[in-house]
């Protein structure tokens, strides 16, 4: 009876070992797949980058910095009058430590006084910390008439230019541009968002510098989705470098 129980026990141990080995193999396989995502930058020669905010959670910047195909990162700093992205200061510090070219952006709220919004942005974004032009995220007009909205926006852009001694980069969607900003941004460098396989073509054929082509990109070091963008045509990273006097 003793030997039968011993044999049963040994059989049980062998079974558990096989189960554990199977589980371990599955875990390794899943982890391997989780670390590799065939993406647009794997199949083309354009210069690519990412846009992040606190929505990406904790970013493993060492992993992001190891990706030689990611040349730049824009990170949200502020929104409106008082909103400050909770991850901004940590993100910009860690991105610099890991060798990335960094720019900061402000989400523009047209109904809020421009001077107050600029103060919010400047309190977070020191020129010395910036590698790339400050960017203004223009996505909403909050029910304003188009003319009043544009007056509001360009007042803010002028204030931003005076504060940082260079014109900011403008981010907006292709449809938003065609409806409200058509023909008005030829003096600015522009990033256009359009999540399609084909490159955007704007109604006035604006020669925009950057294209944000997906909100569902993947990259090692960031859990979940991340916005990805790339330079258009022959445009280069030097065009959006922050000029330090």
Model-derived segments and their meaning:
Residues 50-60, 76-87, 107-116, 142-147, ...:
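Acidic-and-aromatic substrate-binding clefts and catalytic sites of carbohydrate-active enzymes
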Residues 61-69, 88-99, 121-130:
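Acidic (Asp/Glu)-rich catalytic clusters
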Residues 20-31:
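Bacterial N-terminal signal peptides
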Residues 64, 95, 136, 160, ...:
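Conserved, mostly hydrophobic/aromatic
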Residues 35-79:
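Boundary/entry segment of secreted carbohydrate-active catalytic domains
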Residues 132-205:
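Catalytic domains of cell-wall/extracellular-matrix polysaccharide-remodeling enzymes
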Residues 48-51, 71-76, 101-106, 132-138, ...:
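Structural recognition of the beta-strand scaffold that forms the well-ordered cores
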Residues 37-49, 185-245:
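Functionally critical loop-and-helix segments that line ligand-binding/catalytic clefts
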